């Protein structure tokens, strides 16, 4: 009986560890590029961003440092979701809000990359010809990478919720986080920045 509980507990933690690894790994390129590294810049990100990176634009550097830090926070969030000792009620709500928000935002963002890439490849949408080589990276690397991160955070949030004694408020916080992420994504899409 005890072995079954241990096995179930281990199975419940893998999504949190996957989310943590996703966040920490994804932070590496941001910090590398912020420190002036250029490997992978020209072949995997848009030409406009490449030019800003080459110029060491202060706004671009700030974005790289902030996104790198946010990815580290995502890694820490993944680890917080697998903590075996119980968190307090407020912390459980915050973890659910953040995990569902991150999960939905990442999955949506990745899905946009994939759908746009497939629409361009099908000839239904046109983009500037200089962006076509980059499109493959967004369609087949960055898009799936964001979707995988989103799925990891959502699965980690669900696994964490099963360990919380009182589900009601943390569940509501998760719904608010997920819907907030959808609303933010919709606004970004409508304004042309997402």
Identify the meaning behind each predicted range.
Residues 45-49, 113-138:
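Interfacial non-cytosolic loop connecting adjacent transmembrane helices
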Residues 14, 131-148, 169-176:
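Individual transmembrane alpha-helices with interfacial aromatic-anchor signatures
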Residues 42-57:
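Perimembrane loop-to-helix junctions flanking transmembrane segments
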Residues 16-35:
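N-terminal signal-anchor transmembrane alpha helix
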Residues 55-79, 100-104:
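Core segments of alpha-helical transmembrane spans in multipass integral membrane proteins
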Residues 66-77, 140-156:
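Hydrophobic cores of alpha-helical transmembrane segments in multi-pass inner/ER membrane proteins
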Residues 8, 12-15, 79-94, 151-171:
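Cytoplasmic membrane-interface segments at the C-terminal ends of transmembrane helices
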Residues 171-192:
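Final/C-terminal transmembrane alpha-helix of multipass membrane proteins
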């Amino acid at each position: 009986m005890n072995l079954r509980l241990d096995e179930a507990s281990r199975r419940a933690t893998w999504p949190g560890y996957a989310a943590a690894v996703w966040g920490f790994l994804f932070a590496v390129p941001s910090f590398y590029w912020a420190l002036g590294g250029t490997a992978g810049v020209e072949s995997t990100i848009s030409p406009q961003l490449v030019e800003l990176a080459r110029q060491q634009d202060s706004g671009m550097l700030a974005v790289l440092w902030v996104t790198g830090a946010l990815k580290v926070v995502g890694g820490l969030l993944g680890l917080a979701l697998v903590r075996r000792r119980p968190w307090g009620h407020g912390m459980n709500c915050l973890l659910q809000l953040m995990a569902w928000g991150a999960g939905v935002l990442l999955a949506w963002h990745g899905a946009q990359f994939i759908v746009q890439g497939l629409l361009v490849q099908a000839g239904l949408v046109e983009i500037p010809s200089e962006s076509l080589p980059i499109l493959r990276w967004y369609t087949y690397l960055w898009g799936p990478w964001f979707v995988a991160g989103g799925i990891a955070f959502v699965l980690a949030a669900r696994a964490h919720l099963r360990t919380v004694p009182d589900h009601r408020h943390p569940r509501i916080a998760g719904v608010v986080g997920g819907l907030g992420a959808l609303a933010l994504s919709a606004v970004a899409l409508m304004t042309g920045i997402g």
